[in-house]
């Protein structure tokens, strides 16, 4: 199962691209909007609600500083895939760089 966590509802168009592909491959998913900056307890609640489940992958959708990806990865044992939205190549580079430099606890 894939659990998408968006930083805000403004990320829904980007999330739809992902969920359309998940639907195409028959992969079950659920979607939430919760900011690591503004609603960290809500993010933790989502993670807590799913910690006993099997075969979970988190997809985080947040731009700019993208604390969401690192926050989810650091607080869950499940894989986390950061998939930031972007509007152009410059925005893509900022978002990818931010996603890659966010710290998370190692799995090993």
Residue ranges and their predicted role:
Residues 11-16, 40-41, 62-71, 89-93:
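Short glycine/serine/threonine-rich phosphate/pyrophosphate-binding segments
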Residues 27-52:
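N-terminal beta-loop-helix "entrance" segment that forms/cooperates
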Residues 88-108:
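Short, glycine-/small-residue-rich phosphate/pyrophosphate-handling segment
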Residues 1-4, 30, 56-58, 78-82, ...:
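Structural motif
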Residues 16, 72, 100, 104:
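Solvent-exposed, flexible loop/coil residues
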Residues 21, 75-82, 99-102:
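A glycine- and small-aliphatic-rich helix-loop capping segment at beta-alpha/alpha-beta transitions
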Residues 1-36:
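Glycine-rich phosphate/diphosphate-binding loop of Rossmann-like nucleotide-binding domains
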Residues 46-85:
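Glycine-rich phosphate-binding loop
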